[in-house]
Amino acid sequence: MPVGLSVGGALGDPSPSRPFRPSRYVPVSAATAFLVGATTLFLCFTCPWLSEKFSSFIPLYNVVVFLFTLANFCMATFMDPGVFPRAEEDEDKEDDFRAPLYKTVEVRGIQVRMKWCSTCRFYRPPRCSHCSVCDNCVEEFDHHCPWVNNCIGRRNYRYFFLFLLSLTVHIMDVFGFSLLYILHHTKQLDLVQSGVTMAVMCVAGLFFVPVAGLTGFHVVLVARGRTTNEQVTGKFRGGVNPFTHGCFKNIAHVLCSSQAPRYLGRLRKPQSVQVQPPFLRPPLSEAQLAAKVLDNGIQQSKSSLEIMESQSTDADPPPPPKPEHRYPGLPHTQNEECSLLTEAPPTPSLYKYRPAYSSPGKNHTASTHSSKMSRGNSMTESPSVPVTTGQPSYRSDPSLSSRGAAGCRGGAEGGRSGSGGLGGASAFGGRSYPSFTDTLLQSAAASCSSSLRSAHTAHNALGPLISEGTTSTSYKSLANQTRNGSLSYESLLTPSESPEFESAAHELSPPRPHPPHSLSTAAGAAPILGYTSPFLSAQQREGSLQACPAPLRPSPNRAFLRPISSPPSRAPPLSPRARSLGSPPPGPAPGHTPLGKSMSYGGGAELQHRPSSSGGGTSMPNSTIKQNVANHNTHSHKPARGVKKVSGVGGTTYEISV
């Protein structure tokens, strides 16, 4: 009996052990006793005379046949016939009640039916059947043989077939040689050798008929490519067998094919294996560590290596450095500023130019001039002006249109508002601008005044000056650049190369001439305010901050600079109650050409340099008079120093007094 059949292994679930029944071992025990006993008697009592009388090859031949028969008998008995492991308990909880009884598959174009096995809980493969004796589904089940006490299936059918063939031949040999011995000893039948030979011949003759019949039957089945179960049940009796390959191929497949795999594992004892944790080095001695030299030739001891390893595995990596969101303080030197002009400064972050949400007005009007420009109810500074620190605050990009640029150039045109050019820009056109600190305005005004003084000293014509830094565009231009492309460094610093520069050119036009009687108001007003472009680098912006304007003194030469033509009439200022917060801004004063967005840059320049004729004479433009007055108001008494021209980014030329 195959012991391994009742116990499962590692490849599948173990089959339930069969109950012990002594009746199962009677046939196999009888077959083994007759086979071994009869052959032993034949070899002991009959073969010696055959070897003496005929040849010694006869006993040797019978021994070989007997051993071959016994080997096939043992293989057919103890080998796994091809038992399928049973399904898990949780796999058939739902399928057991709903699964159909049969399922059809196609094999070589022929429909083959598979039956549901309720015991093993799966559909049996083709040519598979459930053995009622072994209580297992066997692949290519042939039959259950009681003489070998095992099922004959795919894995052991070859040995069973060879056992039948060899047993038939062995029975024929034993019976024939025994008959030969009796024929030569007819007068000595009373001897022991003759009696034993007659008994062996009877047993061989008794088993020859069924064994020979069974062998012939299986020869026919092998030639046809069928199994005993298929032949008995008549599955392919009236049709075509899809598993046959011809007579010779079928015989070759049974005798010479490779061994089929085993589906049930063998029962093995558990083995204890020591497995070291991963990523751990084996312990090393001090001698081994001393002999180990690193790549740089430095030897380290075991303790130092353990410390380094513990630090590398336990210590957390350092966090990444936090980005610096503000420009650090840099040394304010002229050499650094000039050297930085030759290099491309880094692209500034966009979050520095977002509008400040703390501005009180809708358009982020400066809090210093909110009460004076919008409401008109006070001519003094608001007490709510925040105290600015040393670090500049970059909130937004103002638009230097109309009078705002003139306030940066002249510094004395904001007479109506009382705070320089910014007040004039708010009075004309009613435009409001983003807020920025007074420190930046003063630094920009000082830079502009220095450039005007140096230009007047060198006897140069005072043309329209462009604000320090690059030419800034309006928020509309920046929005167009953001919508049409990225705010790269080139597009921010050189807007004249972009197509949006033309749309913003009218905001950069020089201002109209201002009446000279407003100069007196500007002389006693707040310090001249200016504008520093936020697109400049940190070094350029810090360099402009250190150039603080000198105290402004009235120039004694103001009497020589009188306008030839009479100034136009000035519109009366609005009373504090004349206009509310929601009312539209006042229109331009009579006699002044309104500065709208239709005026281009060239038109503004033409108005400045176009000579005006009064009584056939040529008079100086008001813009020139205005700039001369601004120049004499600032630094007319100080001796002129050297002027250094520096070309900045965006095509802007700077005149720096050294």
Swiss-Prot record:
Q: Write down the superkingdom of origin.
A: Eukaryota
Annotated localization: Cell membrane
- Outline which residue ranges sit on the Extracellular face: 46-56, 181-202
Question: Where is the sequence biased in composition, kind Basic residues?
Answer: 634-644
Query: Does the entry feature the keyword Isomerase, yes or no?
Result: no
GO biological process per UniProt: positive regulation of pattern recognition receptor signaling pathway
Q: Kindly identify the residues recorded as the active site.
A: 145 (s-palmitoyl cysteine intermediate)
Name the catalysed reactions: L-cysteinyl-[protein] + hexadecanoyl-CoA = S-hexadecanoyl-L-cysteinyl-[protein] + CoA
By its UniProt entry, which Pfam families does this protein fall under? DHHC
The UniProt entry, under InterPro entries, shows:
Palmitoyltrfase_DHHC
Q: What is its EC number?
A: 2.3.1.225
Cellular component GO terms, alphabetically? plasma membrane
Q: What does this protein do?
A: Palmitoyltransferase that catalyzes the addition of palmitate onto various protein substrates and is involved in a variety of cellular processes.
Q: Can you quote the domain comment?
A: The DHHC domain is required for palmitoyltransferase activity.
Protein name as catalogued:
Palmitoyltransferase ZDHHC5-B
